[in-house]
Swiss-Prot record:
GO molecular function: nucleotidyltransferase activity; tRNA binding
Pathway the protein takes part in: tRNA modification; 5-methoxycarbonylmethyl-2-thiouridine-tRNA biosynthesis
Function: Plays a central role in 2-thiolation of mcm(5)S(2)U at tRNA wobble positions of tRNA(Lys), tRNA(Glu) and tRNA(Gln). Directly binds tRNAs and probably acts by catalyzing adenylation of tRNAs, an intermediate required for 2-thiolation. It is unclear whether it acts as a sulfurtransferase that transfers sulfur from thiocarboxylated URM1 onto the uridine of tRNAs at wobble position.
Organism listed in the record: Drosophila yakuba (Fruit fly)
Protein name listed in UniProt: Cytoplasmic tRNA 2-thiolation protein 1
GO cellular component term of the entry, any: mitochondrion
EC number, UniProt record: 2.7.7.-
NCBIfam families membership: TIGR00269 family protein
Subcellular location: Cytoplasm
Gene3D superfamilies: HUPs
Main location: cytoplasm
CDD domains assigned: CTU1-like
Amino acid sequence: MPISCKSQCGNRAVLKRPKTGDALCKECFFAAFEAEIHHTISSSNLFRLGEKVAVAASGGKDSTVLAHVLKLLNERHNYGLELVLLSIDEGITGYRDDSLETVKQNRDDYQMPLKILSYEELYGWTMDRIVAQIGRSNNCTFCGVFRRQALDRGAKLLGVDSIATGHNADDIAETVLMNVLRGDTARLRRCTSIRTGGGEDTIPRVKPLKYSYEKEIVMYAHYKKLVYFSTECVFAPNAYRGHARAFLKDLEKVRPSVIMDIIYSGEQLRFKDTVKKPERGTCIRCGFVSSQQPCKACVLLEGLNRGLPKLGIGKKSKGERMIAKQDQELALRERAHLVKNDF
């Protein structure tokens, strides 16, 4: 027997919402999904009239749905935003080169200007070359650090007021779990924040999809027939996040509300005053936001350029010893060369 839509619109239900368990027709699901995102935006005051907003676009389901919904809500509710797409090309053959074609399709479909920045032009390296140097054990560290700074660089170049990212509820719950498991109180403090950054020298980042389930984002993209790139990064299987994701999926089978439960728990966490909070400033080398001197991106880049790819991995003191050792070896070689030339 057909199930009727719970909203009593008279239509037949075609799906069951993972977030609420409600049986809905397509149109009522669209309305509920979009209304929840609008509520998140308006209740958190994510945007102001007349702002220029960069949508971090990867071509995946999250950023594609984010671009689609922001354009729709901007017109429906008169946000008065100027929306642009900002995409980062990490230089991953067979992955990013293909996904950028989807981003270009998004540009045409949503009539938004698109800016693409590459690791090659920003840092002189691609992820393919970095992985060839470092191997697959720490590649996500390099990519994550460089990507975060690349978005800041792109946002500054475009002169935007904020960056909207496609982080969804599952992503945030995974991050809470990761930071708990690692004992990373600094990141645990801010990982559930819907807005981060925005200080004197930083461009804020906002998460309009913070309370949107990944499964519902996939459903929305499917029923709306949105074009998105679904292939996983070829280097992603080795990421630590994958273990947190698998753990979260197991918990969700037992308790469907666990995603929102973890997010709410993260929001309510309080830390003792004695817990040290890292001070954020600007890097003495590149001038971008950092909680250390020099910033992580500059340290990692120095390691690559010195032929010491593991320089920025692990404790700072270890990296300093690696630099000192290399400098000493270079000095000895130079001295030996000078002595040889004297004869």
